[in-house]
């Protein structure tokens, strides 16, 4: 997380360059049988880097996307992981509707 003291806000930065190939963002929600990622985040903003763009949103907007579009989690062992994780796969185009506007 990045803390911005001037405005008392925090930013969690995620990198998902593989999304350029898959068309999906991976939003982790559980690892080692415990809540992680989105379910543990206390950040005010999330910035997802897809290898080209920095996409700004909020945890609330991501939850809204997941719930309103009835997206279920998937379970898999990621590269470099030793155990299964649970994550939400969100189509990049779909998450685009939940990005903050006016931030470059």
Regions found by a protein language model. Name each.
Residues 5, 23, 33, 51-104:
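Non-catalytic C-terminal interaction segments of nucleic acid-processing enzymes
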Residues 16-41:
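Mg2+/Mn2+-dependent nuclease catalytic core
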Residues 10-12, 48, 56-57:
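A structural signal for short, well-ordered beta-strand segments and their strand-loop junctions
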Residues 1-3, 37, 46:
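Short secondary-structure boundary/capping segments within folded domains
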Residues 7-8, 35, 42-45, 52-53:
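Short, surface-exposed beta-edge/turn micro-motifs
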Residues 39-45, 76-80:
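Short C-terminal domain-edge/linker segments immediately following a structured domain
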Residues 2-21:
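Conserved catalytic cores of phosphodiester-cleaving nucleases, focusing on short active-site segments
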